[in-house]
């Protein structure tokens, strides 16, 4: 569908959002623009970028976007290009500004998680008891990055069995650390999400992590945050928007119930 190529950029570098000007400079160079022909002003860069894309069929992937303001100037003027934007929150303005299809990615199923583990370990887990792999996947909360980390741990410690890693992950105080190795670790990803929260929402994230159970209702949330139900719901919904909490139903009085993924709850407790 896109014979003229692809452009890809991770919009966060070393935990910080890239400025649109820097992204435009990189894209213009990728499109063959000599460095001395790239304008200084960001609006001029955007105009040149759109003229370069005019009439072309290019797939543009903008990964880890933090806001509509960050991606606005990166959208092509031509209807022949495709744009894939990924992000956790802050992109509602994008939905309102263009012909956009929103796809929310849910959690992997147990079978999908096991399949991912087998793929990462190059099928070295073929002889492993399927129930052990399902337990390992559950301890990773079926989060792809956590599953990848677990698979890499098993690959780098080939004398370990899946049971060995399961035993290490059963300790809730060590689970996040066990799955956080390297520059692009699970903890660093969670840290970036936390840093992108407003001060009030970040404080709520930390305090809600102190709740003893993964699942809680609005009344418990309000009590934990020492605020009204309306204020608590607003703060909690911000965390839902950021995919840090999930809605799992309603209580007997019609209020929402929320659930942490355990790894995020451990991170929230230590954040702040």
Name these PLM-found stretches.
Residues 1-272:
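Aliphatic-rich helical/repeat scaffold segments used for oligomerization and domain docking
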């Amino acid at each position: 569908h896109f014979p003229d190529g692809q452009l890809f950029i991770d919009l966060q570098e070393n935990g910080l959002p890239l400025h649109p000007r820097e992204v435009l400079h990189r894209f213009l160079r990728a499109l063959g623009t000599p460095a001395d022909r790239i304008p200084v002003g960001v609006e001029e860069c955007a105009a040149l970028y759109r003229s370069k894309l005019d009439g072309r069929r290019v797939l543009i992937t903008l990964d880890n976007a933090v806001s509509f303001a960050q991606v606005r100037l990166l959208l092509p003027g031509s209807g022949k290009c495709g744009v894939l934007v990924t992000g956790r929150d802050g992109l509602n303005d994008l939905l309102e500004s263009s012909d956009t299809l929103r796809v929310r990615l849910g959690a992997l199923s147990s079978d999908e998680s096991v399949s991912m583990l087998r793929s990462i370990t190059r099928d070295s887990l073929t002889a492993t008891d399927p129930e052990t792999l399902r337990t390992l996947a559950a301890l990773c909360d079926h989060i792809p990055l956590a599953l990848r980390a677990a698979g890499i741990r098993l690959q780098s410690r080939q004398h370990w069995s899946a049971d060995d890693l399961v035993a290490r992950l059963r300790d809730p105080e060590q689970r996040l650390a066990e799955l956080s190795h390297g520059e692009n670790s699970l903890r660093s990803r969670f840290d970036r999400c936390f840093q992108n929260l407003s001060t009030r929402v970040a404080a709520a994230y930390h305090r809600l992590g102190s709740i003893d159970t993964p699942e809680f209702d609005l009344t418990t949330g309000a009590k934990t945050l020492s605020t009204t139900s309306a204020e608590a719901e607003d703060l909690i919904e911000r965390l839902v928007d950021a995919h840090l909490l999930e809605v799992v139903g309603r209580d007997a009085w019609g209020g929402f119930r929320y659930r942490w993924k355990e790894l995020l709850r451990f991170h929230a407790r230590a954040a702040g």
